[in-house]
Swiss-Prot record:
This is Type III pantothenate kinase. InterPro entries: ATPase_NBD, Type_III_PanK. The gene is coaX. The keyword Cytoplasm applies. It is found in: Cytoplasm.
């Protein structure tokens, strides 16, 4: 079994793979102050309550956009699984040509998503990841990572409205039935959700123009992907586990090197 970690600014998503099959997944809050012992305990409990044995884990791979948390997670991996985790970053085999001005500037999460999407759906394609930030990534027909756009996440936008406007409440993010609303809460929900749908549709439309492909697939992932996809025809597929699948694919591309490295050590 392979354990994968997708570490975002808000949540850490963990997945357990047996071959290509995702057999279990969990989500916990990203906590920079949590110690390696605390993370190890939480992971051990997940395995225990789901009838999985930590001793069956053959290897670990981590993708993170939060550098401050890496020491705790790497140390937790050493304690639980007696091995150094594979970290997605410089020097790792991705199998993807990154056409960015400085490839090191591309977030690991964006590359992981692009690899999974191209492997599963082919190209050209656009990936929209609804996370703390919403990222738009373009992949060519030949599987090249072309770049993309980054905008504030829908929750960040919602919280900013609540924090900066004294009389406006914090609202639940749901898909409103109409745009012309008759109370403050519904009006905010309509403005946030439909405004965000408009943002997505406009960016996707312009990316398709630049790609010179009106037929390229648009894949959505992330916690709020279903909410936004339900209100627009711009999104073709919602793939909740795209990042986890990408990590498993990257691990497989680096498996032989890992085995050789472990034998030498």
């Amino acid at each position: 079994m392979i354990l994968v970690f997708d570490v975002g600014n808000t949540n850490i998503v963990l997945g357990v793979y047996r071959g290509k099959e995702l057999i279990e997944n969990w989500r916990i809050a990203t906590d920079k102050d949590k110690s390696s012992d605390e993370y190890a305990m939480v992971i051990h409990q997940f395995f225990h309550y789901n009838g999985l044995n930590i001793h069956d884990v053959d290897d670990v791979i981590i993708s993170s956009v939060v550098p401050n948390i890496m020491y705790s997670l790497e140390n937790a991996s050493r304690k639980l699984f007696k091995r150094e985790p594979l970290i997605v970053g410089s020097g790792i085999k991705t199998g993807m040509n990154i056409k960015y001005d400085d490839p090191k500037q591309v977030g690991a999460d964006r590359i992981v998503n692009a690899i999974a999407a191209y492997e599963k759906y082919g190209g050209p394609l656009i990936i929209v990841d609804f996370g703390t930030a919403t990222t738009f990534c373009a992949v060519s027909e030949d599987g090249e990572y072309l770049g993309g756009a980054i905008s504030p996440g829908i929750k960040i936008s919602s919280e900013a409205l609540f924090e900066k406007a004294a009389k406006l409440p914090r609202v639940e993010l749901i898909n409103p039935k109409k745009v012309i609303c008759k109370n403050t809460v519904s009006s905010m929900q309509a403005g946030i959700v439909y405004g965000y749908i408009g943002l997505v549709e406009n960016i996707v439309r312009n990316m398709k123009k630049e790609l010179k492909s009106s037929s390229c697939k648009v894949i959505a992932t992330g916690g709020l992907s279903t909410l936004i996809a339900g209100g627009t025809d711009s999104i073709d597929v919602v793939d909740k586990f795209l990042s986890l699948d990408g990590l498993n694919i990257i691990y497989e591309r680096n498996r032989k090197d890992r085995i050789l490295s472990n034998k030498k050590s």
